[in-house]
Amino acid sequence: MSTINVEHTYPAVSSLIADLKSRKVQGPFAVAVETALVMRQVISQTRWSTVDQLIDTVRAVGSTLVKAQPTEFSCGNIIRRILRLIREEYQELLKTADENEKLIVSSSNSSSPSQKRDIPSNEKLVQSHEPVSVQMYSSMLNLLGRPTLESPTHSKTVGDSRVTGGMDMRAVIISGIQDVIDELDKINTDIEVQSMDHLHSNEIILTQGCSKTVEAFLRFAAKKRKFSVIVAEGFPNNQKGSHAMAKRLAQAGIDTTVISDATIFAIMSRVNKVILGTHAILGNGGLVTYSGAQLVAQAARHHATPVVVCSGIYKLSPVYPYDLESIIQLSSPDKIMSFNEGDLISRAEILNPYYDYIPPDLVDLFITNLGGYPPSYLYRIMNDTYDASDTIL
């Protein structure tokens, strides 16, 4: 299915593509929720006769959405979760059908031998004229509450997936997508309740940027712990957001101080723990996060200060940082140097990266909605969440 066909067939997909390109929808959480809602509509509108057809449709829609905004990794992550969901539900349905078939066959074989001997030889020939595969297929469909098909050719193989026939997976898949949406809605709640295990009284915590997950994490711990928070402003892209978050933390009763990025290294020796948010977690355990966060992580490593990252599993992406330039999004340089300075602007190339990359060796712990894990354990979570065949959409 081509990109043009996808956009014309599903108006919701076309609308989300426009929102992604115009940055009307941005940020990992908003993109993840919108992607899940759109995919729920796609599944409800799509007609398919095989699981392969459904998977191809979902992959085509996912590929189109990812190309619309490649730096929004959560879009592709939700697509991969839905593909994994489809495969798991299909395998579970086949397993149930196979068990029912075996039960029917074993019950028919347990009939009395005397009844079998009373059957004339010509009747045996007539009964055995129908292939066993037809009988088993009919039994399976009858058990599933669907009419028996006329011919066994309806159960032919397409790729590695049998035609689902009467197996209606639509409701199960839509229910699974709704579970993903519900999980996204309570991500911060699942993470913030773990704060009591990681934050202690009289500690000095340093954070950078304006992560809502980190803010919820700190505010929850402040209900029973007394600690101080230092917020690095993240000039120039996150300056306003950092000041706004610091104000909210202060209103929650937390001793909060805002510092410039230039003083991070000098103050790091007094910091007990660094807590960061992230835009995405890559396949190698590295982070795509706020610009300037690598400076914080490098300073923390020099002073042997632990770096903790708060993130939902939906930000975990199997993409590897082979090409950092394609991953790091650039922002307008006007925040660094005004366009009014025409003479200097015409003679200089100014880059303003919106995101920064932190290697996995600079991170000590990931706190997710599933619990706390070291970077070396992320591959296990990734294998449990995504299918290896969906790494590239």
From Swiss-Prot:
The UniProt entry's GO biological process terms, in alphabetical order, are:
cytoplasmic translational initiation; regulation of translation; translational initiation
Q: Does the keyword Signal apply?
A: no
| Region span, Disordered | 105-125
Q: Where in the cell is it found?
A: Cytoplasm, Cytosol
One MF term in GO for this entry?
A: translation initiation factor activity
Instruction: Name one matching Pfam family.
Output: IF-2B
* Keywords, alphabetical: Cytoplasm, Initiation factor, Phosphoprotein, Protein biosynthesis, Translation regulation
Gene3D superfamilies for the chain: translation initiation factor eif-2b, domain 1, Translation initiation factor eif-2b, domain 2
Tell me its family.
Belongs to the eIF-2B alpha/beta/delta subunits family.
Q: What does this protein do?
A: Acts as a component of the translation initiation factor 2B (eIF2B) complex, which catalyzes the exchange of GDP for GTP on the eukaryotic initiation factor 2 (eIF2) complex gamma subunit. Its guanine nucleotide exchange factor activity is repressed when bound to eIF2 complex phosphorylated on the alpha subunit, thereby limiting the amount of methionyl-initiator methionine tRNA available to the ribosome and consequently global translation is repressed.
Q: What is this protein called?
A: Translation initiation factor eIF2B subunit beta
